[in-house]
């Protein structure tokens, strides 16, 4: 039986590679369209910046891995074989769904896809288990982590609203500041605008994302939380001075720096969040296999 599960794990690993390829094709436009659209750098430079963001962002993804492990359903309510079937069904469905949307040229959220695939697969497995045991489907909620599932779904819906409102407000303010008399306004407040943008990127990227980093120690996170305001003020003042020097003496367009930094941060956030959508389920299956193997070894020792 163990060889059967090893074959399933190998197949899940292959599907993970395919899913990663298909998923990145779907999500790449999210963090590349701004930089490539305005042509502030060459295609190769933009790809290098985005690639670096993905590589570094992968180290911040451990906090999202729990969604695949136990965020949608209660794994203790299922047997190991049922867990493997659930994960297998999720990965196959994800590849087919994303590839179909890519072929049709339709955008889709990989997070929404994986969440509802896990939810649907777990619900189907739980319903089959209840019916096979002659129990009522009313007990289905005991198998599903309803509070966490509702929290994830509501978070996705809220993020759409927040993104729309914040994007509209920031775009309006930016157009109001720089659309008229661009050269004069750029020399006066370009450094302040750039410093605010870079500071905000660092805050959300590093300081808020540090909790999910695999290499961060508890004392480092505590120090960041205790000194958030001084760090942000120092960064804002420092970048304001630096950008003003770049504008006044070197005639450097700091907007190019901001756009590349934004591209890096979006790729970074993609790796820390959406990358789990492609590899989280196979890793959860591997962890389940290790737990099952350890339990089998203990049972043999007791015998």
Language-model features and meaning:
Residues 40-51, 295-297:
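Membrane-interface alpha-helices at helix entry/exit sites of multi-pass transporters
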Residues 17-24, 28, 54-67, 90, ...:
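Transmembrane alpha-helical segments of multi-pass membrane transport proteins and ion-pumping complexes
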């Amino acid at each position: 039986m163990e060889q059967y599960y090893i074959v399933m794990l190998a197949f899940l690993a292959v599907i993970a590679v395919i899913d990663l390829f298909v998923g990145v094709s779907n999500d790449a436009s999210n963090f590349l369209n701004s930089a490539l659209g305005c042509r502030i750098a060459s295609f190769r430079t933009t790809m290098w910046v985005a690639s670096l963001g993905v590589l570094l962002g992968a180290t911040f993804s451990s906090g999202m891995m729990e969604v695949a492990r136990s965020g949608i359903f209660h794994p203790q309510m299922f047997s190991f074989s049922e867990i493997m079937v659930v994960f297998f069904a999720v990965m196959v469905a994800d590849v087919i769904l994303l590839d179909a949307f890519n072929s049709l040229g339709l955008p889709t959220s990989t997070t929404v896809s994986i969440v509802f695939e896990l939810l649907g697969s777990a619900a189907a497995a739980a319903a089959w288990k209840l019916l096979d045991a002659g129990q009522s489907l009313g007990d289905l909620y005991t198998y599903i982590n309803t509070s966490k599932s509702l929290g994830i779904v509501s978070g996705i819906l809220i993020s759409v609203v927040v993104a729309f409102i914040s994007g509209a407000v920031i775009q309006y303010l930016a157009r109001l500041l720089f659309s008229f008399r661009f050269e004069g306004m750029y020399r006066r407040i370009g450094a302040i605008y750039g410093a605010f943008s870079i500071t905000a990127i660092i805050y959300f990227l590093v300081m808020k994302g540090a909790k999910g980093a695999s290499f961060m120690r508890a004392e480092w996170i505590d120090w960041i939380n205790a000194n958030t305001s001084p760090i942000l003020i120092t960064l804002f003042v420092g970048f304001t001075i630096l950008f003003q020097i770049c504008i006044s003496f070197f005639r450097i367009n700091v907007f190019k720096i901001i756009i590349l930094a934004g591209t890096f941060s979006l790729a970074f956030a993609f790796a820390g969040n959406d990358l789990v959508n492609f590899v989280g389920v196979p890793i959860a299956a591997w962890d389940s296999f290790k737990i099952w193997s350890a339990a089998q070894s203990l049972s043999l020792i007791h015998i």
